[in-house]
Regions:
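Short beta-strand to alpha-helix junction loop
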Residues: 100-119, 261-264
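Single conserved hydrophobic/aromatic residue that forms the stacking wall/gate
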Residues: 392-402
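Active-site-proximal substrate-binding core of FAD-dependent oxidoreductases
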Residues: 342-383
């Protein structure tokens, strides 16, 4: 199979790429073909996250999203930040953490937003194939020329079942990787083409996420809570509790994977956090609806690899566009996808050979990452408490530890 563009990953970045490219197709009366591969059974199947969503990228990609009934139904009404001691929460004044000001943002289900984006993409002519993971990259003369989907009908022992189907080769003029954090194809091109040369080592965290139905008497639609401190006061961990619609709450706990204590269990720390009085009061008599975990990429600007490679692009969290100081990456991922869609169209239709890295550097993605560039390195080098004190006074540190 051959397409003009193949996109790997049906998250915010991949879908934004597909939509922007298809919009330009329509505007220019062209008929370039676009294929998007998603490993989940449907778009959004692997996206559990409740999310405080900054809508500026969506405003730019689909300005009339309100008229099209995008699932942004709960504007943020109130922000609360706490530093936790074991049995109490100390309120933190908003001016101490200005990046946590969520005025103008929305509490959403990111999975629902991606499903809606998938519908918009299909209406524009994008071919979306859920249930087809991209397992291998295809090369020709040291250039990526497409992907191979995974073989179907393989037993747990790696043997072919009678009804097996071999993977399909999908070739394209441009292959765009939006797999999310630590996507295996993204790791392959970063290593093969030395895209992280002269960059600081990348940093990762693990995030545990749950969706709860809580007591309507305790539910405050539009309330956003962020906490740090106990139960991991010596680690730059963080947590959140978002009051969404329909008496649902999205909760999460993030621990960086550079912790030194070999006996620490991130999952158990999450369970302890849920026992804190500020959190427990909401969850008592509630019902957990779903749960999951995922890796986060949080090295920021200093660790951002080159996003161009021969035959393709890296976008979103496959590259590392998350803004750690905000604990937000959906808006930057979506914007990187929009820019990738335009870059791909210019390259294929107009034969414009510009650097995608220069496109990123001229966008507000770079400005956001630049403003938060000190956040991760200072916490990594000096710890949670001293790091917080130095955050706005220290010059930009380099963080050479992975």
């Amino acid at each position: 199979m051959e397409y003009d563009v193949v996109i790997v990953g049906g998250g915010p970045s991949g879908l934004a790429t597909a939509i922007k490219f298809a919009q330009l197709n329509k505007e220019n009366n062209t008929n370039y073909s676009i294929c998007l591969l998603e490993k989940g059974s449907e778009i959004g199947a692997h996206i559990l996250s409740g999310n405080v969503f900054q809508p500026n990228a969506l405003d730019e990609l689909i300005p009339n999203w309100k008229e099209l009934n995008a699932p942004l139904n709960v504007p943020v009404k109130k922000d609360k930040i706490f530093y936790f001691l074991k049995n109490m929460g100390i309120p933190v004044p908003p001016f101490v953490m200005p990046a946590m000001n969520n005025h103008g943002n929305y509490i959403i289900s990111l999975g629902n937003l991606c499903r809606w984006l998938g519908e918009q993409a299909e209406q524009l002519g994008v071919e979306i194939f859920p249930g087809f993971p991209a397992s291998k990259l295809l090369y020709e003369n040291d250039k990526v020329i497409g992907v191979q989907t995974g073989d179907m009908g393989i037993s747990e022992n790696g043997e072919l079942k009678p009804a097996n189907e071999p993977g399909i080769n999908i070739k394209a003029k441009l292959t765009i990787l939006g797999e999310g954090c630590r996507g295996h194809l993204g790791k392959e091109v970063i290593n093969k083409y030395n895209l992280s040369e002269d960059k600081d080592p990348q940093h990762y965290g693990i995030g545990f996420k749950e969706v709860w139905k809580i007591d309507p008497k305790l539910h405050e639609e539009g309330l956003v809570i962020h906490t740090n401190g106990w139960p991991t006061p010596d680690i730059a961990a963080g947590s959140y509790f978002y009051h969404g619609e329909n008496n649902e709450a999205y909760i999460g706990f993030v621990i960086p994977l550079d912790y030194q204590n070999p006996h620490l269990s991130p999952f158990d720390e999450f369970q302890r956090w849920k026992q804190h009085p500020v959190i427990k009061k909401y969850l008592t008599n509630g019902e957990r609806l779903s749960y999951g975990a995922r890796a986060l990429i949080k090295g920021g600007l200093q660790s951002l690899p080159k996003m161009d490679f021969p035959g393709g692009l890296l976008i979103g969290c496959n590259a590392g566009t998350l803004v750690f100081s905000k604990i937000k990456g959906s808006h930057t991922a979506m914007k990187s996808g929009e820019l990738a869609g335009k870059h791909a169209f210019d390259k294929i239709h107009n034969n414009i050979e510009t650097s995608f890295d220069s496109v990123i550097k001229e966008s507000w993605i770079y400005n956001e990452l630049y403003k938060s560039r000190n956040f991760g390195p200072i916490f990594h080098k000096f710890g949670a408490l001293l790091g917080a004190c130095l955050l706005y006074t220290s010059p930009s540190p380099r963080d050479t530890n992975p």
